[in-house]
Amino acid sequence: MKITRLTTYHAAPRWLFLKVETDEGITGWGEPVIEGRARSVEAAVHELAGYVVGKDPARINDLWQTLYRAGFYRGGAILMSAIAGIDQALWDIKGKTLGVPVYELLGGLVRDRMKTYRWVGGDRPGAIIQQITDYRALGFDTFKFNGTEEMKLIDSARAVDAAVVKVAEIREAFGNSIDFGIDFHGRVGAPMAKALLRELEPFKPLFVEEPVLAEQAEYYPRLAASTSIPLAAGERMFSRFEFKNVLCAGGIGMVQPDLSHAGGITECVKIAAMAEAYDVGFAPHCPLGPIALAACLHVDFVSHNAVLQEQSIGIHYNEGADLLDYVINKDDFHCVDGSIAALPKPGLGVEIDEEMLKRTNENPPDWRNPVWRHSDGSIAEW
């Protein structure tokens, strides 16, 4: 079997899908994307195509290493996301060729169901309590929301209090019947993170995500020493080599690599295993589309330290399409009491409606990240 062609499709609201075809008619799907930089990743995918067209798709490890090493320069968001989507598609092809789900190729299940959580509240959170109430009725008991709006490097007591009041209201409304993670989203600088963690600790959040940006990772152990709240990070780390440094330094209780950013299944299986050696949980970042979610689930189902899975049904970014709109076999992704069962079909186990993708690409979406500014006019972290 040889790879014959790579085709990319833009998908609303902000996704990029990749179809990898072979000379035997078996196709694989991947999701290589950086939110807001889909066209850059698309260009990288097609530039990398020369390394894989004409090659045997079964040699996943060799192709991955070639894509990573052959260009001399390596790593970074764009290249690793391009590799991630190609890698996902190769695993999809291999599973379909052998007639088994990808998790069987990775050693088999360590669990029958994977716990997921729901996003509530957006960048400017509104009726979070009502959203939680609605999702509780569907069986979900674990949620995540943004902890702050834009925050200055040194900000006021009012800014801290605004974040605390929101969390206090949620805990008061639901008691300990729910769990929630709080996403600082890289908006909080190191000087304010310690104060926020101290004030939020009485409300027992399940975790705080990106307490500071990845480039300030040296603060993770210092912040962890100041709080009992587990700290989570990893959506803006792109290889096991970046996670190696964070794990060795300590401080993180949960790693969150993104299967569409951090080199795909091949790389993230290794990251999960590294984290397990440090007694650190694995909770893949995935506010993306169905192919990315499927890839995450296969790694979750073979990783003993997988604790939670993010998924984007109903997330505030999903304008124009929701998570399963491009999926034919929607029932396989059905959540029961907030958990998803192991996907039963061969490969990644997601069947994509290519005709719908083609219609979407007649007028392809071009999503961009919001640009925020502080009151003084300076750029703010979104």
Swiss-Prot record:
EC number: 4.2.1.6
SMART domains per record: MR_MLE
GO molecular function terms listed in the Swiss-Prot or TrEMBL record: galactonate dehydratase activity; magnesium ion binding
Region: Disordered, residue numbers: 361-382
UniProt KW Calcium keyword: no
Top EC class, one word: lyase
UniProt site positions, description: Transition state stabilizer: E310
Cofactor note: Binds 1 Mg(2+) ion per subunit.
Entry's Gene Ontology BP terms: amino acid catabolic process; D-galactonate catabolic process
Keyword Magnesium attached: yes
Pfam families: MR_MLE_C, MR_MLE_N
Catalytic activity: D-galactonate = 2-dehydro-3-deoxy-D-galactonate + H2O
Keywords, in A-Z order: Lyase, Magnesium, Metal-binding
SUPFAM superfamilies: Enolase C-terminal domain-like, Enolase N-terminal domain-like
Site (Increases basicity of active site His): D258
Note: Reaction proceeds via an anti dehydration.
Function text: Catalyzes the dehydration of D-galactonate to 2-keto-3-deoxy-D-galactonate.
Descriptive protein name: D-galactonate dehydratase
Native source species: Xanthomonas euvesicatoria pv. vesicatoria (strain 85-10) (Xanthomonas campestris pv. vesicatoria)
Gene: dgoD
